[in-house]
Amino acid sequence: MNQEQIDQLKDLIDYERKRKSPPKDFPKLPDLPGKRYTDKEFFDLEKEYLWKQSWLLAGHLDEIPEVGSYKLWDKAGQPVILVRKSKENVTAFYNMCRHRGAAIVLDEFGQSDKLVCGYHGWTYDHDGNLIGKRDPKDFVDFDDSCRSLHKVKVELLGNLIFVNFDLDAESLKENLGVIYDEIQEFQFENLSLIDHYTYRLKCNWKIALEANMEVYHVQSIHCLLYTSDAADEGLGVDLGGRRII
């Protein structure tokens, strides 16, 4: 963080501490329809036009440490195979054989020098190219180059693996914009995966997400974190601490 950023942060904290009303020219926002959180049709639209066109965190390099290691990721409605092609590169494909659509990978994690469909034995390399099929003599005028696995766009942010189902999507760096440079201080390339937990919540995904985007609930839910000087406490920056800013 350079001096200009430090001064800007101090000015913002000072402004927020003194503020007694909404910021000037703050727009009047409409109420959100309740169906945005309950309607299946709206959720289906989100999956189609949001999740399929966004960069999604799919894993960590520590989960596929060796060349040929793979992970089956199925968190967005489309099972994806993440493959450690080399030390620096990861490839990603839909978990669907180009012959009859059978799943190629069944286990969540594994390692193999090639990807083999267990149904009819079609075989693919780590780039998704079809490199072998059983009884090739029975396939007349067959072009193997047209039968590669369907790719999923994949990029690394340090040791973090991100995927995007939209092959024409802008790069992860372009998508993050100015945030990309700001988050470099976290040094994702030096972070190791120690453990991970999965929690299933009986709510729409936006309910869980928004709970981590606002502090309006802190006084009620996290009362042990709330002090008499909460207005100032909430404006602090604890570098290296376990704080949500």
What are these model-predicted stretches?
Residues 63-167, 173-180:
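Rieske [2Fe-2S] iron-sulfur-binding domain
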Residues 226-233:
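Conserved small/polar residues in nucleotide/adenosyl-binding loops
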Residues 223-226, 242:
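Short, low-complexity export/processing leader segments characterized by acidic and small residues
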Residues 1-96, 100-107, 152-156:
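N-terminal pre-ligand scaffold of iron-sulfur
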Residues 60-63, 220-224:
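A short, aromatic/hydrophobic, helix- or strand-capping loop or linear motif
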Residues 150-222:
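Extended catalytic-interface subdomain
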Residues 237-245:
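Hydrophobic alpha-helical segments, chiefly the membrane-spanning helices
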